[in-house]
């Protein structure tokens, strides 16, 4: 659990906002129960270069010195794109190469020697080029020297693009990707938590976590970057959790001033619950340093210890129904100590929705049984139920976490 700068501040991040967000987590959210195993990651995303060398070093030292009242420690995280270059200054010298190579040298080439066109605005770097390898060594050494414990590596698919590679033994994009990722794993040596983003699903084994979908913010619906968008990925990708990676559901975004932040506690709780059921990896990305609305929403959204306790179990839910096309299912389930947890979502921003779940869709062995109780995890209240099913009415954008108990 922790905080990420991207949706909150993007290219406006600075050391005051970075440290201020960490301080709010320490002083306000941690006492409410936010955190997992008494560790909070405070992560810089893109545009961390807004901080000069002294500011970056001082900020990292400050984060590492932070302690919550309960002993929770704080660890810094950072962001990097090892296989993508974002500038059009192709004559710039490559870091770590002692001016031996310029960026145009290390970019992936077409058979005629021209550069492979940009993808998503970035040039593809050839992982097999010695200049690219030196660049990787340079950045990883700098990150580890500063004391970063968490590394989000983004746009990794750039390293798997097809082209003519510097090393003639590398004949495919995936061979190049394997080469580049192996270097990262070898040179971090288990000393950093590696979270992969925009990365091939296979080959796996090169990171601890992998983004389940792409960027996700705080709105319940509306297409890309919504809670439903991310849960569509969980609907069809739940099986990757712990089999390939820890599933990363991206950040929880609260408040109007952040990018597509949740506009209410109800909507924010739905985004939080979507992260909880995706394995419990929760990174807030709200303007906690300087936005009173985001601070108020955060206290309301992260204020239920029972929900956070479920998140701390680090287990992923499965969809009850799996034939939903390009939409997410609205009901997810996983075993609990007393039966099963069930998470339900209303993706409609304007209308309430009643959801009815037959017991035998959850477990074929469940039949009409008066000993089954349906409990709201957040409040502990017991809900009424039918003989063969239970129904819940959700307000617009609302979600709920229930436990069916029979053990």
Predicted regions and their residues:
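Structural recognition of the beta-strand scaffold that forms the well-ordered cores
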Residues: 1-5, 40-44, 75-80, 150-154, ...
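The substrate-binding groove and active-site-proximal loops of carbohydrate-active enzymes
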Residues: 2-16, 44-54, 118-134, 157-174
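Catalytic domains of carbohydrate-active enzymes, especially glycoside hydrolases
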Residues: 17-47, 143-147
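An active-site-proximal structural segment forming one wall of the substrate-binding cleft
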Residues: 26-33, 125-153
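Substrate-binding/active-site clefts of carbohydrate-active enzymes
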Residues: 52-56, 71-137
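C-terminal beta-strand-rich structural cap/linker in extracellular carbohydrate-active enzymes
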Residues: 386-407
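Carbohydrate-binding surface patches
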Residues: 269-271, 275-278, 283, 321-366, ...
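Glycan-recognition surfaces
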Residues: 101-130, 134, 185-291
């Amino acid at each position: 659990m922790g905080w990420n700068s991207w949706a909150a501040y993007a290219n406006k991040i600075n050391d005051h906002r970075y440290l201020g967000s960490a301080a709010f987590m320490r002083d306000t959210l941690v006492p409410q129960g936010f955190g997992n195993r008494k560790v909070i990651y405070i992560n810089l995303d893109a545009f961390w270069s807004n901080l000069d060398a002294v500011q970056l070093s001082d900020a990292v030292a400050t984060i590492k010195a932070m302690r919550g009242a309960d002993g929770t420690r704080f660890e810094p995280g950072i962001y990097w794109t090892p296989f993508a270059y974002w500038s059009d200054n192709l004559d710039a010298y490559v870091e770590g190469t002692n001016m031996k190579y310029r960026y145009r040298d290390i970019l992936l080439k077409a058979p005629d020697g021209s550069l492979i066109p940009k993808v998503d605005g970035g040039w593809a770097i050839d992982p097999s080029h010695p200049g690219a390898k030196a660049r990787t060594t340079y950045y990883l050494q700098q990150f580890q020297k500063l004391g970063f414990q968490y590394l989000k590596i983004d746009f990794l698919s750039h390293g798997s693009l097809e082209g003519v590679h510097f090393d003639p033994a590398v004949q495919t994009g995936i061979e190049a990707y394997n080469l580049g990722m192996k270097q990262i794993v070898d040179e971090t040596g288990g000393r950093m938590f590696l979270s992969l983003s925009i990365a091939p699903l296979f080959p796996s084994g090169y990171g601890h976590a992998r983004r389940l979908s792409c960027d996700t913010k705080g709105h319940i619906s509306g297409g890309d970057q919504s809670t439903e968008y991310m849960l569509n990925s969980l609907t069809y990708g739940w099986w990757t959790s712990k089999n390939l990676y820890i599933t990363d559901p991206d950040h929880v975004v609260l408040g109007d001033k952040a990018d597509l932040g949740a506009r209410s506690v109800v909507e924010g709780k739905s985004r939080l619950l979507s992260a909880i059921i995706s394995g419990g990896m929760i990174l807030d990305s709200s303007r906690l340093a300087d936005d009173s609305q985001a601070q108020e929403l955060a206290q309301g959204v992260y204020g239920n210890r029972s929900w956070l306790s479920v998140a701390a179990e680090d287990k992923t839910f499965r969809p009850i129904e799996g034939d939903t096309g390009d939409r997410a299912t609205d009901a997810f389930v996983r075993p609990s100590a007393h039966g099963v947890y069930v998470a339900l979502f209303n993706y409609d921003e304007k209308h309430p929705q009643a959801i009815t779940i037959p017991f035998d869709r959850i477990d074929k062995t469940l039949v009409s049984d008066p000993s089954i109780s349906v409990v709201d995890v957040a409040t502990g209240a017991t809900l009424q139920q039918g003989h063969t099913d239970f129904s819940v009415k959700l307000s617009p954008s609302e979600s709920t976490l229930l436990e069916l108990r029979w053990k």
